Amino acid sequence: MTPRPSSSGPDPRKTTGKKPAGKTPTGKKPAKAAKKKAPRRTTASANASATTSVSGAEVAVSPAPDAADRERLLAGTHHDPHAVLGAHRVPGGVAFRVFRPYALAVTVLSGELRVGLHDDGDGFFSGLVPLKDVPAHRLLVAYEGTEQEVEDPYRFLPTLGELDLHLLGEGRHEQLWRALGAHPTTHEGVAGTRFAVWAPNARGVRVAGGFNFWDGTGHPMRSLGSTGVWELFLPGVGAGELYKFEITRPDGSRTFRADPLARRTEVPPATSSVVHASDYTWGDEEWLAHRADAPAHEAPMSVYEVHLPSWRPGLTYRQLAEQLPAYVADLGFTHVELMPVAEHPFGGSWGYQVTGFYAPTARLGDPDDFKYLVDRLHRAGIGVLMDWVPAHFPRDDWALAEFDGRPLYEHSDPLRAAHPDWGTLEFDFGRREVRNFLVANAVYWCEEFHIDGLRVDAVASMLYLDYSREPGEWEPNEHGGRENLDAVAFLQEMNATLYRRVPGVVTVAEESTAWDGVTRATHHEGPSGFGGLGFGLKWNMGWMHDSLDYMSHEPVHRKHHHGEMTFSMVYAYSENYVLPISHDEVVHGKRSLVSKMPGDWWQQRANERAYLGFMWAHPGKQLLFMGQEFAQGAEWSEAHGPDWWLLDPEYGASADHRGVRDLVRDLNTVYRATPALWRRDTHPSGFSWVVGDAAEDNVLAFLRLDADGTPLLAVSNFAPVVRSGYRLGVPDEVPAWHEVLNTDAARYGGGDVVNPDPVKPEPQGGTAARRASG
């Protein structure tokens, strides 16, 4: 290892040509004046080596690398530098070979043995020592004005075992992050960091970082058989070091690349990877012990969707941990869903164009800080879902795109590689190593960060070969269809692996088409001939679009759109659904939830309250994006986040916004306490229409039923008039009804048109009828 500069290390793309002071470029011998400054005991010339040996060993012959090895090492294209460098038994003793560009002299140290090596030029040093066995040894390396005693990285055996290599070759290493990437470790009694990267098309790979002044010339990696993996153990390198891989492409050009398996990164726009070692101690054992008590579709789930960087702009993970759990718990949500946390270079992508799939974004802190946030949420009784983006990745030339000089993570067919909507690249789901990268990534977040579930983004774009493509821009699959069979197999493998490894986890699909069996088990074949995709839940995009369209119309016109509020029950039990009012619906000119509603400010709030009441009563889990819980009027912006000032008592209209927030809190309280609202979300026996055809009245009414038949009656009046004495047919075995929530209550900012308590039905022909108002 060369002397470290005082700075943390510049961007390697800008500093490849910079050399530490007093050092000479590769290929040039140190000047004579420089030699005189080297320590006298290790002074060496190109033709002789002055040696001091307590044991009496002498360098008899210089076993320098042959011309071919030398050329490949200098060019960065050697596949097995350990076979040349380090110490090796040869006829006559042990040959020592060292490649230390810019060094003036190198001495081998082993116990009392001190042997100065020949300077063979171009940074190569060698010597033959008459020893019987290869000793454990260190190197004393002299530079101009200084010298360092270091370990020889080329004396170590590979750090990856046969099982790791077998699983890597099969594409079945379910803990891939433990094999690849950068890992501080102790190897053969020496502390350092193991670097490993998959780059099968590379002619050679070196590791560069602050520890070698971003010049990887002296640190070539070895290729491990047919796996395509390159590996090197660097003694003395520890947590916190910046690094990249310097890859020689098939055409001989070089590129610096961030580690695809980096578990920590620099803060964007900087792009280096960071060696990371976690020492976090979790405190969420009780949460994990009960997480699998009930499957997600049979448990209450009310989700608060959060964009962490803008929820309270400027807060770190640890600062968020002091505020977010308390806020979410106070409002009664069962889960948060975090928009993508994995590292991404462009904040304006909201995290949906990922470059660091294994690293939480460094904008808010380090990986242990993110663990602390998850831990605090769990200890507050809140589950953590995370948006996960396996469909595509950006084209940044320091990340995954043509990683080793050829299409690697992306499909080799340009028609399959380019995503037509986002200008990104789609993963090659048919390549086993790529599939392994993604499946292991899903497992990684759930095992290492205790994430309770993944909401998989853009599933529809993965499933169809013709997604957003015109005729001629795609080719059918082997059966002549438009289904992406590779993506189907990947999603099935991901879900099956995750559910097997992580008890209590849930996966959620953002899938906007009528694909059959999104939440069906992978081993159950459907009418289309495919097994299910194996997700636990699916976003109900149809319900969202239809219901929001209905609400956007003036009440006088809603009778013409009544079916948009009832059609969801036609297919409600075809999948396990989430009802999403997500970030996508409150940006880019779509307006916030309350601003979608017609009428004046009072009517807009009344409409939003009525809509939220309908949403919480409808079969399916709920998801609400931040800011909508208090009727923010403006669209969301990642630059400034929710308008919290609307809740400030000093603001004149704050009571209006606090009223909607209080409604959301009470909706969650009633929801969690009422099994009829969630236990039979996926069973037709849990729902019964009472009034489904009153289009002229803008009225809907239905029963939700618990497993024992205990009912809850939900009544929605989407007209701007009070319907006093409105008659509804209800089961006659219920003697009285208690109104648990009315969205028009004064405390929510409504007109306080509520029902008496209790409401007693009036018998009529074997069926009770109750009078309702509101």
From Swiss-Prot:
Residues of the region (Disordered) are 1-66, 748-774
Which of the seven top EC classes does this enzyme belong to? Answer: transferase
Q: Which domain of life is it from?
A: Bacteria
The catalytic activity, as recorded, is: Transfers a segment of a (1->4)-alpha-D-glucan chain to a primary hydroxy group in a similar glucan chain
Give a Pfam family name. Answer: CBM_48
Q: Name one GO cellular component term.
A: cytoplasm
According to its UniProt entry, one GO biological process term is:
glycogen biosynthetic process
User: Which InterPro entries did the record assign?
Assistant: A-amylase/branching_C (IPR006048), Branching_enzy (IPR037439), GlgB (IPR006407), GlgB_N (IPR054169), GlgB_N_E_set_prok (IPR044143), Glyco_hydro_13_cat_dom (IPR006047), Glyco_hydro_13_N (IPR004193), Glyco_hydro_b (IPR013780)
Q: Which SUPFAM superfamilies match?
A: (Trans)glycosidases, E set domains, Glycosyl hydrolase domain
The UniProt entry annotates the active site at: D457, E510
Q: Which Gene3D superfamilies does the entry mention? A: Glycosidases (3.20.20.80), Golgi alpha-mannosidase II (2.60.40.1180), Immunoglobulins (2.60.40.10)
- Establish whether keyword Ligase is in the entry: no
Q: Which intervals carry biased composition (Low complexity)? A: 41-55
Q: What pathway is this protein said to act in by its record? A: Glycan biosynthesis; glycogen biosynthesis
Q: What keywords were assigned to this record?
A: Carbohydrate metabolism, Glycogen biosynthesis, Glycogen metabolism, Glycosyltransferase, Transferase
Subunit annotation: Monomer.
Role played: Catalyzes the formation of the alpha-1,6-glucosidic linkages in glycogen by scission of a 1,4-alpha-linked oligosaccharide from growing alpha-1,4-glucan chains and the subsequent attachment of the oligosaccharide to the alpha-1,6 position.
Name of the protein: 1,4-alpha-glucan branching enzyme GlgB 1
Species in which this protein is naturally found: Streptomyces coelicolor (strain ATCC BAA-471 / A3(2) / M145)
Q: What gene is this protein translated from?
A: glgB1
